[in-house]
């Protein structure tokens, strides 16, 4: 099992040790070790840090003092006395900077502002307006600034994470195609947000972000090998292998909507939907419910599951039919990837055991190696929390780079975080020159 804290590790640039053998580089690398140890353990004494990091007490004391000056650590009281002098405790300054996670959907855009410990400070939800790429990107920029409005005293923005529907080129930050957002093809979302806010930006597929969210805070917490399956308007999967999202050679991994479960239908063109979404996507289920229920139903999926619970025969048959198709798809995925856990989420997946129990029966019949199959623990927040985590990882790199490069205090500023009155921009690490930063000292 992976360490529960692993998702938030500071980035250790071991190559820097090879490139730069000079004492200054080594001291900065040791400072990163100290920051990571303090963040993992919470309040800790300098003596305990020395034991945990295997650094000498004088070196730890000097590094801690410098990190306190930088604003990355603070003294928070004294340890319980064991008979001698009580040791002063230090803790990580989570409000050194903040991040924004964004869940971009075809109907809503959701935002979360969090400190560097991952604690959510503010949230915002708004309907997705005009789906044209330029208009949506303008809406996101306005949404971020609105999120900051009224947040007096908040630290500067350090990083942004966005979960977008459809295929994404994570390396370049491009949304290759989003079937549920009209006109979205090769949209350079990362470049636009980086230019506007002058901070690093992470872009990924929304289902991959949901997998990250479950890995960080949900029912897949600490499990390095699992699959998150999103069932809703679309059907997709986020695949975690050895603690890393698997995206494939062309960013196509997890596009399970194109799984074909009937060999006689391989010639049929199911379009951008694919076979699986054509049969068990939200629109397909609603159509089938309207046909089967006739005058008894209005096509609403929640009404379908409610009717099945109440013993409506047609509704129960349809739920079993949907679960069977999904069960065969999950069985194929399990046979191929051998995950320890399958998490089912999305709007339809959130119905829970009513869908999962018949789905499990199919998987148990087909597959000899049985994974756990669970409903999402985060509900509709999985994508949003995954976006926050992706931003936190970038923020940790920014903090590490500031130490390694001998920069000033990084993102920290004494001025309140509000949109700049002249430009409307949220201040970030790329706009340090507009702010009075804390007094800093080079690491010893």
Regions found by a protein language model. Give the residues of each.
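Phosphate-binding/catalytic loop of phosphoryl-transfer enzymes
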Residues: 102, 116, 156-275, 389-416, ...
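ATP-binding/phosphotransfer module of carbohydrate and carboxylate kinases, centering on a glycine-rich
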Residues: 1-78, 82-156, 196-197, 263-267, ...
């Amino acid at each position: 099992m992976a360490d529960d804290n692993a998702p938030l590790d500071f980035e250790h640039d071991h190559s820097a040790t090879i490139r730069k053998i000079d004492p200054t580089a080594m001291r900065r690398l040791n400072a990163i070790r100290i920051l990571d140890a303090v963040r993992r353990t919470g309040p800790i004494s300098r003596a305990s840090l020395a034991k945990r990091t295997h650094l000498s007490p004088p070196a730890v004391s000097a590094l801690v003092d410098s990190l306190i000056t930088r604003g990355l650590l603070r003294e928070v009281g004294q340890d319980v006395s064991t008979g001698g002098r009580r040791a002063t405790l230090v803790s990580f300054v989570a409000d050194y900077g903040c991040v924004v996670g964004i869940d971009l959907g075809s109907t809503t855009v959701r935002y979360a502002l969090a400190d560097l410990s991952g604690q959510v400070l503010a949230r915002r939800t708004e309907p997705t307006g005009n789906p044209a790429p330029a208009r949506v990107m303008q809406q996101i920029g306005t949404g971020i600034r609105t999120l900051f409005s009224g947040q007096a005293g908040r630290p500067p923005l350090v990083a942004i994470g966005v979960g977008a529907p459809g295929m994404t080129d994570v390396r370049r930050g491009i949304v290759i195609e989003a079937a549920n957002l009209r006109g979205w093809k090769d949209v350079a979302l990362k470049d636009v947000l980086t230019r506007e806010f002058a901070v690093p930006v992470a872009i990924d597929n929304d289902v991959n972000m949901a997998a990250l969210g479950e890995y960080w805070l949900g029912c897949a917490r600490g499990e390095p090998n699992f699959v998150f399956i999103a069932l809703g308007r679309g059907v997709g999967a986020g695949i975690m292998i050895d603690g890393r999202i698997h995206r494939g050679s062309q960013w196509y991994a997890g596009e399970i909507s194109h799984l074909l479960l009937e060999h006689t239908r391989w010639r049929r063109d199911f379009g951008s939907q694919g076979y699986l979404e054509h049969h068990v996507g939200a629109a397909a289920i609603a159509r089938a419910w309207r046909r089967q229920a006739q005058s008894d139903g209005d096509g609403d999926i929640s009404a379908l599951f409610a009717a099945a619970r109440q013993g409506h025969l047609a509704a129960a048959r349809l739920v079993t039919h949907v679960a069977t198709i999904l069960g065969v798809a999950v069985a194929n995925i399990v046979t191929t990837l051998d995950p320890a856990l399958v998490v089912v989420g999305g709007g339809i997946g959130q119905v829970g055991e009513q869908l999962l129990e018949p789905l499990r029966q199919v998987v148990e019949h087909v597959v000899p190696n049985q994974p756990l199959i669970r409903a999402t623990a985060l509900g509709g927040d999985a994508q949003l929390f995954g976006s926050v985590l992706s931003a936190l990882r970038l923020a940790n790199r920014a903090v590490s780079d500031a130490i390694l490069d001998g920069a000033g205090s990084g993102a920290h500023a004494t001025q309140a975080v509000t949109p700049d009155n002249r430009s409307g921009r949220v201040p970030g690490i790329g706009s340090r020159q507009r702010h009075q930063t804390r007094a800093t000292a080079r690491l010893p």
